């Protein structure tokens, strides 16, 4: 058998092994992709409706359409989750006129962090994040409410004077990934809201919302900064905007107890 044939067989075998390994990883990672929805639909909502007790959630607001759940990862991380099935950022429901403003609701829910911490937390130390369709493990929309990474806060502060009320690339990106940023006011956070600002103002975003991760943090001025990154096979970026967060909350003066 010629060396070229052996080499081709070797490459083919290697390719098959890579595909099988990728499939196994995908299966293990996403086999429990409905875990959050099961907690909300089978525990939090029933307990709230029958016993007026949101457990294991911290809050269930059925009229407003959301629940807040303490995440197991990190002492202060919470998740805001819709009380109706919504897969994620790619869902067209988020861009309808009647959709709740989940980002605004998540920002209001940040008080759970301070309550758990036992002291006020500066808004500039807090961040919200939703991962792209390719950078998440759950198929129920959830917004991470957690601390901002110290190095991210420092990097953003270096450019704070340049942030405008329109999308612009962030020079140098963050954590090795490309990001676009937009300054938004408190009014814009409420209306039209982050999902609409991304879909309506970022060229081409409305047709491929699932490829975007989206995050928000407060600026010292009282405005907010919206950050978006886009999944890319070329740069191996899954657009997990959660990467901007630090669930151990090193940014706080005193580290919280798990």
UniProtKB/Swiss-Prot annotation:
Q: Which reaction does it catalyse?
A: a CDP-1,2-diacyl-sn-glycerol + H2O = a 1,2-diacyl-sn-glycero-3-phosphate + CMP + 2 H(+)
Any idea which GO molecular function terms this record carries?
CDP-diacylglycerol diphosphatase activity
Pfam families associated with the record:
CDH
State the source organism's domain of life.
Bacteria
Predominant subcellular localization, coarse grouping: membrane
Keyword list, A-Z: Cell inner membrane, Cell membrane, Hydrolase, Lipid biosynthesis, Lipid metabolism, Membrane, Phospholipid biosynthesis, Phospholipid metabolism, Transmembrane, Transmembrane helix
Pathway terms, separated by semicolons:
Phospholipid metabolism; CDP-diacylglycerol degradation; phosphatidate from CDP-diacylglycerol: step 1/1
Asked whether the keyword Metal-binding is assigned, the reply is no
Q: How does it sit in the membrane?
A: Single-pass membrane protein
Name a single GO biological process: phospholipid biosynthetic process
Record EC number: 3.6.1.26
What family, per the record?
Belongs to the Cdh family.
The identity of this protein, by name, is CDP-diacylglycerol pyrophosphatase
Species per Swiss-Prot/TrEMBL record? Yersinia pestis
């Amino acid at each position: 058998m010629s060396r070229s044939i052996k080499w081709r067989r070797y490459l083919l075998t290697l390719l098959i092994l890579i595909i099988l390994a990728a499939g196994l990883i995908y299966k293990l990672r996403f086999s429990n992709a409905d875990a959050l929805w099961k907690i909300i639909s089978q525990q939090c909502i029933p307990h709230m409706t029958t016993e007026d007790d949101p457990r294991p959630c911290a809050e269930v607001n059925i009229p407003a359409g959301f629940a807040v759940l303490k995440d197991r990862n990190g002492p202060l991380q919470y998740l805001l989750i819709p009380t109706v099935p919504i897969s994620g950022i790619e869902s067209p429901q988020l861009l309808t006129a009647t959709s709740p403003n989940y980002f605004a609701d998540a920002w209001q829910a940040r008080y759970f962090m301070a309550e758990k911490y036992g002291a006020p937390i500066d808004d500039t130390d807090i961040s919200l994040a939703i991962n792209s369709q390719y950078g998440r493990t759950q198929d129920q929309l959830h917004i991470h409410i957690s601390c901002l990474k110290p190095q991210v806060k420092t990097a953003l502060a270096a450019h704070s004077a340049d942030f405008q009320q329109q999308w612009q690339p962030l020079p140098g990106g963050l954590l090795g990934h490309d990001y676009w940023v937009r300054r938004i006011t408190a009014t814009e956070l409420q209306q039209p809201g982050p999902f609409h600002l991304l879909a309506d103002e970022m060229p081409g975003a409305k047709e491929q919302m699932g490829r975007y991760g989206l995050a928000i943090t407060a600026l010292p001025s009282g405005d907010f900064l919206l950050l978006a990154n886009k999944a890319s096979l070329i740069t191996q970026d899954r657009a997990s905007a959660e990467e901007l967060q630090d669930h151990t909350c090193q940014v706080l003066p005193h580290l919280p107890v798990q």
